């Protein structure tokens, strides 16, 4: 049975009010199983909101605390993940919120509390399509069976803009990378831009630990010397990309 739900969220941080329709979910894969493929490399059934934000001077802790607090007005208040910058691009946090299979922006909104208005220096908001929430949570290690065991996970967050005429090649490559024999990731997600920022694909790779991340980097460096290796192939198809290492602060 489907229901129509209106989400009214905080406009300043891009949690725009949306109307969405969502149905019953499919059973989750077995917990702890190694993901066979990148979630979202093929079928993308659901809409997500991606919010990158830079904290105002001296407000990083307050902003993080606010971002990781579930919005009680949302019908799916726990359908989000918050990642915190450790090394890489200029943003401090990224919040990825699941909206369901459909979303529409409405004019009505909720006023931002006065004490929250100055927490962010800047932000960007982008709607993307991606895998089901079940696939997403499995890949990111935040499903009910895993999230208490994956608090030490490391997430590499990357976004890409393909060179003109190379969109399909880049998308294919991003979906293939986790299948490499020396890959140490525990889960991968690929999402595609619908509306918002100037990138086309968002990829998130999860590692169980910093040791696993380091091992993956050590394994991949020799590949940069190969003409057909991932390092060179990426630069055959990409106009722009950034990579940022993060940890998870919610859930």
Regions found by a protein language model. Give the residues of each.
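Short S/T/G/P-rich N-terminal loop/turn motif that feeds into the first structured element of a domain
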Residues: 23-251
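C-terminal segment of classical bacterial N-terminal signal peptides
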Residues: 14-22
């Amino acid at each position: 049975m489907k229901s129509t739900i209106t989400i009214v969220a905080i406009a300043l941080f891009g949690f725009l009010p949306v109307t969405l329709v969502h149905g019953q979910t499919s059973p989750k894969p077995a917990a702890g199983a190694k993901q066979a493929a990148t979630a979202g490399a093929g079928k993308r059934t659901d809409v997500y909101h991606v919010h990158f934000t830079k904290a105002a001077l001296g407000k990083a802790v307050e902003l993080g605390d606010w971002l990781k607090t579930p919005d009680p007005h949302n019908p799916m208040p726990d359908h989000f993940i918050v990642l915190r910058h450790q090394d890489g691009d200029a943003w401090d946090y990224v919040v990825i919120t699941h909206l369901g299979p459909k979303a529409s922006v409405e004019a009505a909104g909720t006023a931002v509390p006065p004490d929250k208005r100055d927490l962010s220096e800047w932000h960007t908001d982008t709607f993307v399509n991606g895998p089901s929430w079940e696939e997403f949570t499995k890949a990111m290690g935040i499903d009910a069976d895993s999230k208490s065991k994956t608090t030490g996970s490391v997430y590499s967050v990357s976004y890409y803009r393909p060179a003109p005429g190379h969109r399909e090649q880049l998308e294919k490559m991003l979906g293939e990378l986790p299948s490499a024999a020396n890959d140490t990731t525990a889960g991968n997600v690929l999402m595609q831009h619908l509306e918002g920022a100037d990138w086309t694909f968002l990829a998130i790779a999860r590692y169980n630990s910093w040791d696993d991340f380091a091992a993956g980097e050590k394994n991949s460096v020799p590949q940069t010397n190969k003409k057909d290796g991932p390092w060179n192939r990426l630069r055959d198809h990409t106009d722009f990309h950034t990579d940022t290492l993060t940890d998870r602060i919610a859930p």
